[in-house]
Regions:
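Short, acidic/polar N-cap/turn motifs at the starts of alpha helices
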Residues: 58, 312-316, 346, 380, ...
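Residues that flank catalytic or metal-binding motifs in active/ligand-binding sites
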Residues: 91, 185, 313, 345, ...
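Extreme N-terminal leader/anchor segments
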Residues: 1-71
Length: 566
């Protein structure tokens, strides 16, 4: 097939020339030829949404909280993008999965318009993660896009696949892509190698690249090195589809890939609350519960959820109906700290399907300006000193988003199981250098699931700085559905299912303040938080507990004495 460079091809060729780090990588990338056919169309295990299809048909393209409307028959690619995130989502083409066979002419026309478009300066469409997502989308939706296609369009499409694979090959070179996006690039490159009839030239090395990234990024307990609970979910959505491609082709699934899948599925269950959502730590926001359910349905053997993930740094206390998930880890390596939060020793607490204590979570696309505030220690259910975070954030060049650096150097975890309860004994020294203090936290859950209690102390750091005058604040952020009412005994909490809890504490005054919950699918929601405040000093000792209250009797259920019935 003779290559003809259209708009996308020209942009890809220019980027290839700029990104080649060595002559070998450039020459090797040029060995990736346009396919003449695809052996198989990979499945897409993400859920399709007919309402999104209706919006696309009507010319509405809504992504990352922004909407662009185009006239019937017009393509959106040459229009001014409302934001870089919107452009990434548009040109990643994940939205193709929502369309059906009746949309084939429109889908083909939109893809062809993108391939012919001139693009823009510093186009997000050519970022490695976007190229990888687009390649995966094009491969998965190839029946929709190629069935009954004319030869010229077919050729342009196949050339675009090859151009994308070349860009990914270079993106996986030394010092190019970083963090979790390297995993995405490697998955997409392997999928091309297995699906395209010309992929054999790079298949062995592409699989080695993927295995290397999986070994580097997925830890022994199944968590991701960046500590975001949602990253394994995002990975499995693509990795499970790739496993099915290997099976359909009659190829042996790489051992590293099989081990990673077997590890990450239980890890997802460990980090899952009773309502189906993942815990809000280190960049996790609103959970796409349908996607999580689809992924967990692929787990072949299911035992109890793990209680510990020591490599990733999480702990679980579980006694139905109560569940507590705890951040017991330090800062991830710098290359993977772009989403990390300063939430060491924070916890989330739920009862059945009712969330009680939460972290604020990562904001969605509706509220990107709140991202940095959501990463501070104050946005987590833990203790802060001097209105500062237990870790420091460093703004990198070009304003790409801050990375968490200089988090706690030492985090200790001990788990003690007793006859009637289990206790986590935790410490971190994130405030040692600035204030000469260590935060010690004990969390205890009774085995009948009734009482969840804790103890927070400030200790003198043995190798920290001098103690400085400062205030502390111990925060318990409440889910927006929880109603908090002060009482003489503490704070009464009314849950969404009408269950009531009493929060009580000793060692500090209890206050109720405003909070914000960023992890709602529709955007930030107002919430409340319980705050215990005082002067930070060695010897601070606060004990607190959540205990169920008896249900209120409604007038209709009140018992009437027999003599009053006469």
């Amino acid at each position: 097939m003779r290559e003809r460079l259209g708009g996308f091809g020209v942009r890809a060729a220019r980027l290839l020339a700029r990104q080649a780090t060595t002559p070998y990588r450039l020459i090797k990338s040029l060995s990736i030829k346009p396919p003449t056919r695809l052996w198989i169309a990979p499945p897409d295990i993400r859920t399709a949404d007919s309402t999104v299809a209706d919006e696309v048909r009507a010319g509405y393209f809504t992504y990352e909280g922004k909407t662009l409307h185009v006239a019937a028959g017009e393509a959106p690619f040459a229009r001014f993008a409302p934001s870089a995130g919107w452009r990434r989502a548009l040109t990643g083409f994940s939205w193709l999965r929502h369309l059906d066979e009746t949309d084939r002419p429109m889908a083909r026309r939109l893809v062809d318009a993108f391939l012919s478009s001139p693009g823009m300066r510093d186009d997000p469409a050519l970022e490695p993660a976007v190229v990888a997502r687009r390649l995966l989308s094009f491969l998965a939706q190839s029946p929709l896009l190629l069935d009954e296609a004319d030869p010229d369009y077919y050729e342009r499409f196949m050339q675009a696949l090859a151009h994308s694979a070349r860009l990914l090959w270079l993106a996986l070179g030394p010092g190019k892509s970083r963090g979790a996006e390297r995993l995405l690039c490697a998955v997409a490159l392997v999928e091309f190698a297995v699906c395209a009839d010309t992929g054999g030239a790079i298949a062995p090395e592409a699989m080695r690249l993927l295995s290397r990234e999986l070994q580097r990024q997925i830890l022994a307990d199944g968590g991701h090195i960046g500590r975001n609970p949602q990253t394994p979910l995002d990975l499995l959505l693509d990795l499970l589809a790739l496993r099915q491609v290997f099976a359909a082709r009659g190829l042996k699934t790489p051992e590293t890939m099989k081990r990673v899948i077997a590890r990450t599925l239980p890890m997802l269950r460990m980090m899952q609350h009773g309502d189906g959502s993942l815990a809000l730590f280190n960049g996790a926001g609103a959970t796409a519960r349908d996607r999580l359910a689809n992924v967990l349905a692929h787990e072949e053997t299911r035992g109890p959820a793990p209680l510990q993930a020591p490599a990733t740094g999480y702990q679980r206390l579980d006694a139905f109906p109560a569940l507590a998930l705890v951040d017991a880890g330090g800062a991830p390596p710098a290359d993977f700290a772009g989403d990390a939060h300063a939430g060491c020793l924070s916890f989330e607490y739920s009862r059945g399907t009712e969330r009680v204590v939460v972290n604020c979570g990562a904001p969605g696309p509706h509220n990107p300006e709140a991202r940095e505030a959501a990463r501070t220690t104050a946005a987590h259910s833990t203790l802060t000193i001097g209105e500062t975070s237990s870790a420091r954030f460093l703004e990198p060049p070009r304003g790409a988003g801050s990375r968490l650096v200089e988090g706690p150097d030492k985090v200790t975890v001990e788990r003690r199981a007793h006859d009637n309860e289990t206790t986590l004994i935790l410490t971190h020294d994130g405030y040692a250098a600035a204030f000469g203090l260590v935060h010690a936290r004990d969390l205890t859950l009774s085995h009948d699931g009734r009482t969840f209690s804790g103890r927070d102390r400030l200790l003198t750091a043995t190798d920290g700085g001098a103690t400085k005058p400062a205030d502390f604040a111990l925060r318990f952020h409440l889910h927006p559905q929880v109603k908090a009412t002060p009482t003489a005994a503490g704070v009464e909490l009314a849950l969404g299912n009408d269950e009531r809890l009493l929060f009580s504490a000793t060692g500090a005054d209890v206050q109720i303040e405003e909070s914000v919950y960023y992890a709602h699918p529709a955007g930030a929601r107002p919430a409340r938080q319980i705050v215990l405040a005082g002067k930070a000093a060695a010897g601070v000792d606060i004990q607190w507990s959540f205990t169920p209250l008896p249900p209120r009797l409604s007038p209709s259920s009140a018992t009437v004495p027999p003599e009053e019935k006469l």
